Every structure is written in structure tokens, then in C-alpha cells.
Amino acid sequence: MTVLTIYREDLPEQPLTQTTDAAEIAALLAQQGLRFERWPAQVELADDATPEQILAAYATEVDRVKTEGGYITVDAVSLRPDHPDRAALRQKFLAEHIHSEDEVRFFVAGQGLFSLHLGDHVYALLCTQNDWISVPAGTRHWFDMGSQPYFTALRFFNNPRRLGRSVYRQRHRQSVPAPALNSGSERDNFILSLALAC
């Protein structure tokens, strides 16, 4: 289930807002210049579906987003719990960073947690299957895929070489309990890291 939780950066243990309503999530994110949509499931895809099969299944939505946003390249990526570099990849994306182009993702399967550092607040969005999010260039954020990552996502790029520049900055973090990342079966709970003031 998709969940948006909003915290003050200095009081992560006291959520100001928490909602699972897709329309409310979209409205709250739109107030901050972000876009969120729920796309209808087109077909049931196998866990080992190829990037070509995934792109074909969502061709209508992909074409619409490419046209609206001027995106040139779209690809599909998957990460599973047995990936040998999952711990290193998780640590890399837990560092707060910005991109020189929009970060646009659609979750075909599984889930992941985007934490968006907007002013003195953090918007923690647990994205699940059929969620689409567009994070504007220059937005401070980090991504937690959990200790046992399971997701497949479409990625949209303005740059045909998919080389959007990332700037990573380490920030102090405080661990706060958060919803468990799972893929339909029970998974171990993970700890959501929220940025605190430097």
C-alpha cells in the first residue's frame, strides 16, 4: 500500500500527516511541485519479464509521459534480494542527493521509499506497484530499497545517454520506525532514515 508521511526534519518521530489516499498524496505532492499518479495495471507480468515486455505493457502511459515531459529515453531496471551488491547499492542511494534532471520512476512491481527533503520538512513516500512519481531536478532526496530489495521500475530520462549528474551529500540521519517494505509476502521491517538539520 502506498503511504505518504510528512515530518518536520527536526521531529521525524512526530508525523504531521500520514495518508494512503492516492488523490490526497497527489495533491500534497503537487503543492511542492512534484507529480504522483497511479497507473492502471495493464497486464500481469512475469517476475522475469524482459525490459521490452515491460515497456510494451505500459506503452500508452510511457508515450504520454515522454511527450508531456520531453523524455528521450526510458528503460526498465530490477533489483531482487539475491543481488550480490544490494547492500552497497542501498547505501549509495541512502545518501541525500540531487540530480541535474528530473527523476521519474514508475513501479512495475515491488516497492521503494523516496524521502524528499523539501525545506524543513521530509516527505517520505512509500511507492508500490503501479505508482508513478516525478521528482524535479535539484530536489534533495534519498531512496531506501530496504535490506531485501524487490522492485522493477521504469526510468525516464531527458538525456539519451542516461547520464544525469548526481551530487551526493552525507547528512546526519536518525532512525525512525516506518512501514515494512514487502513484495506481497512478509519481509523484515526496515528502518526509515530521515534527514535531520545539520
UniProtKB/Swiss-Prot annotation:
Reaction(s) catalysed by this chain's protein: 1,2-dihydroxy-5-(methylsulfanyl)pent-1-en-3-one + O2 = 3-(methylsulfanyl)propanoate + CO + formate + 2 H(+); 1,2-dihydroxy-5-(methylsulfanyl)pent-1-en-3-one + O2 = 4-methylsulfanyl-2-oxobutanoate + formate + 2 H(+)
Site (Important to generate the dianion): 105
Binding site for Ni(2+): 97, 99, 103, 141
Name of the featured protein: Acireductone dioxygenase
Lineage of origin: Bacteria, Bacillati, Cyanobacteriota, Cyanophyceae, Synechococcales
Assembly behavior: Monomer.
Positions bound to Fe(2+): 97, 99, 103, 141
Function: Catalyzes 2 different reactions between oxygen and the acireductone 1,2-dihydroxy-3-keto-5-methylthiopentene (DHK-MTPene) depending upon the metal bound in the active site. Fe-containing acireductone dioxygenase (Fe-ARD) produces formate and 2-keto-4-methylthiobutyrate (KMTB), the alpha-ketoacid precursor of methionine in the methionine recycle pathway. Ni-containing acireductone dioxygenase (Ni-ARD) produces methylthiopropionate, carbon monoxide and formate, and does not lie on the methionine recycle pathway.
Necessary cofactors: Fe(2+); Ni(2+)
EC number: 1.13.11.54, 1.13.11.53
Transmembrane segments: none
InterPro entries, sorted: ARD (IPR004313), ARD_bac (IPR023956), RmlC-like_jellyroll (IPR014710), RmlC_Cupin_sf (IPR011051)
Family from the record: Belongs to the acireductone dioxygenase (ARD) family.
Example of a GO MF term: nickel cation binding
Species, as recorded: Synechococcus elongatus (strain ATCC 33912 / PCC 7942 / FACHB-805)
